[in-house]
A protein has these predicted regions:
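ATP-dependent adenylation/nucleotidyltransferase module used to activate substrates
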Residues: 1-152
Length: 152
């Protein structure tokens, strides 16, 4: 399956990409969310931003395009459940929630690479991240499989 790798620049997102390749998937693009210009790190429930400035080097090494977006939202919906349980219904979360930044980024990647069917995710122990990534992936205009080989 052709996939996009969500990449923070950290070891977990990179290691998960290795697992994707070992499982026969083809990385066709990378995507990253970074702090607004002038900030190196932000306090985010959803995103690791410490290594965001090195992500371009990984994309160059893999010879795949890199899609970047700024993290504009904040963690408005901090509950265990995100949005509607039925992914065919419109998300009831605020457009200002940081999770929606991921949705907009993946939508942009999917428009450029309509053959992408999955997303590599380096989440290990965070149900908070897993629930939100899965919610975004199963929206009708994306329909992507979440590939989190490192999960627990």
């Amino acid at each position: 399956m052709k996939i996009v790798g969500l990449l923070s620049g950290g070891k977990d997102s990179c290691f998960n990409l290795c697992h994707c390749v070992l499982n026969g998937h083809e990385i066709v693009a990378l995507a990253t969310l970074a702090p607004t210009q002038g900030k190196d790190e932000i306090d985010s429930y959803m995103y690791q931003t410490v290594g965001h400035d090195a992500v371009h080097a990984i994309a160059t090494a893999l010879d795949v395009p890199l899609y970047r977006a700024e993290i504009r939202g904040t963690a408005l919906n901090q509950g265990a459940v995100y949005g509607e349980r039925d992914p065919t219904k419109e998300c009831v979360s605020s457009l200002e929630d940081e999770t929606e930044d991921l949705y907009r980024l993946l939508l942009r990647v999917k428009e450029k690479h309509p053959d992408i069917e999955g997303v590599s995710v380096g989440a290990i122990l965070s149900n908070y991240q897993r629930v939100r990534v899965e919610h975004v992936c199963c929206r009708p205009d994306l329909r992507l499989a979440s590939l989190a080989y490192l999960w627990k």
